[in-house]
Swiss-Prot record:
Gene encoding the protein: ASK3
Organism listed in the record: Arabidopsis thaliana (Mouse-ear cress)
Highest rank taxon of the organism: Eukaryota
Region (Interaction with the F-box domain of F-box proteins): 105-163
Similarity annotation: Belongs to the SKP1 family.
Protein name as annotated: SKP1-like protein 3
Listed pathway(s): Protein modification; protein ubiquitination
Keyword Transcription regulation belongs to the record: no
Keywords attached to this entry: Nucleus, Ubl conjugation pathway
Pfam families for this protein: Skp1 (PF01466), Skp1_POZ (PF03931)
Subunit structure: Part of a SCF (SKP1-cullin-F-box) protein ligase complex. Interacts with ADO3/FKF1 and At3g61590.
Length: 163
């Protein structure tokens, strides 16, 4: 007899509903706590996550739950063993445009999914590596709101960072 898996409904900020296995949903500590507090009867509203981003988050969680199951249920397998296929998949997963990457980062933070948060933060850090402050501002479309005097003061106080 086939085992039926408990399903959870997740509702995005733009009204989309996603039916997800509980094992996948609890990759999010935020959702896990809502389930533990019995707050799932009518679905779990996620007001800070759009449907498009929630679909990507679910894809990430599903992939990692499946990979952990293949590794014998060891959730720490990613760091303790060489799982090149998953690492490659993760690297490809964050090859998205800037707005999507930042939305994924915000969703990972809001949903408290540590693996996804680490992955998205690393992707942003990798984009910053080797760039000057001016190049980073241009790359991330950040306005420089320092006066030349303020910028010189910051550079002087933090000389070690500019060497």
């Amino acid at each position: 007899m086939a085992e039926t898996k408990k399903m959870i409904i997740l509702k995005s900020s733009d009204g989309e509903s996603f039916e997800v296995e509980e094992a996948v949903a609890v990759e999010s500590q935020t959702i896990k706590h809502m389930i533990e507090d019995d707050c799932v009867d009518n679905g779990i509203p996620l007001p800070n996550v759009t449907g498009a981003i929630l679909a990507k988050v679910i894809e990430y969680c599903k992939k990692h739950v499946e990979a952990a199951a293949e590794a014998g249920g060891d959730k720490d397998f990613y760091g303790s063993t060489e799982n090149h296929e998953l690492k490659t998949w993760d690297n490809d997963f964050v090859k998205v445009d800037h707005p999507t990457l930042f939305d994924l980062l915000r969703a990972a933070n809001y949903l408290n999914i540590s693996g996804l948060l680490d992955l998205t933060c690393k992707a942003v850090a990798d984009q910053m590596r080797g760039k000057t402050p001016a190049q980073m501002r241009e790359h991330f479309n950040i306005k420089n709101d320092y006066t030349p005097e303020e910028e010189a003061e910051v550079r002087n106080e933090n000389r070690w960072a500019f060497e």
